[in-house]
Amino acid sequence: MKGNWSIVRKVLHRQFSTLRSSTPSSRLSTSIRPLVLAPNSISSLIARNSLFTASNIGPSIDFNFSNTSLPHRRSLCSEAGGENGVVLVKSEEEFINAMSKAQDGSLPSVFYFTAAWCGPCRFISPVIVELSKQYPDVTTYKVDIDEGGISNTISKLNITAVPTLHFFKGGSKKGEVVGADVTKLKNLMEQLYK
């Protein structure tokens, strides 16, 4: 998707490079109007103004610039949670219930404290999903520290950085990993839950 944006940006740059800052705004607006009114014409502009031909790009480019012919890459976005054995905690009540299960010993658990803006969290999130599949008897809770009512409760746990992972077994906290240390995370999971 990023590649398509760079192509569109180059085409638009070529299209409007002849315009100067002294050009009246009406000329600029009439130059842009066809793109705004007919966004699907962008693929024809790309075909005329680049090394690509219409047959190379074809119908795979549409207004949202999705191109399904590109190879899939590992996403750097934090997983949404809820699938793959990771439980997304959305409220203070859900967090308290999950923590109660972990502390009464009925459920071995991992609490993954994260934030949407956190780069290392996005890096380690696929590893956590993989480990939750590898250890299906361990419940992994994903907790966004910026989520509405959860922040007050989390502040009592002294979470000073994200990602932070707390590991519970037998009713008590057995370990903690702060940061995106994949080796330490995998070793601690194996040590506690194998």
Swiss-Prot record:
Record-annotated site: Contributes to redox potential value: 119-120
Annotated S-S bridges: 118-121
Transit peptide, residues from-to: 1-42
GO molecular function (one): oxidoreductase activity, acting on a sulfur group of donors, disulfide as acceptor
Any one of the GO CC terms: cytosol
InterPro entries: Thioredoxin-like_sf, Thioredoxin_domain
Domain spans labelled Thioredoxin: 89-194
Compartments reported by the entry: Mitochondrion matrix
Residues with the Phosphoserine modification: 75
Keywords: Disulfide bond, Electron transport, Mitochondrion, Phosphoprotein, Redox-active center, Transit peptide, Transport
Entry-linked SUPFAM superfamilies: Thioredoxin-like
Residue numbers annotated as active site: 118 (nucleophile), 121 (nucleophile)
Role played: Thiol-disulfide oxidoreductase that may participate in various redox reactions. Possesses insulin disulfide bonds reducing activity. Reduced by thioredoxin reductases NTRA and NTRB.
Family assignment from sequence similarity: Belongs to the thioredoxin family. Plant O-type subfamily.
Protein name in the entry: Thioredoxin O1, mitochondrial
Species whose genome carries this gene: Arabidopsis thaliana
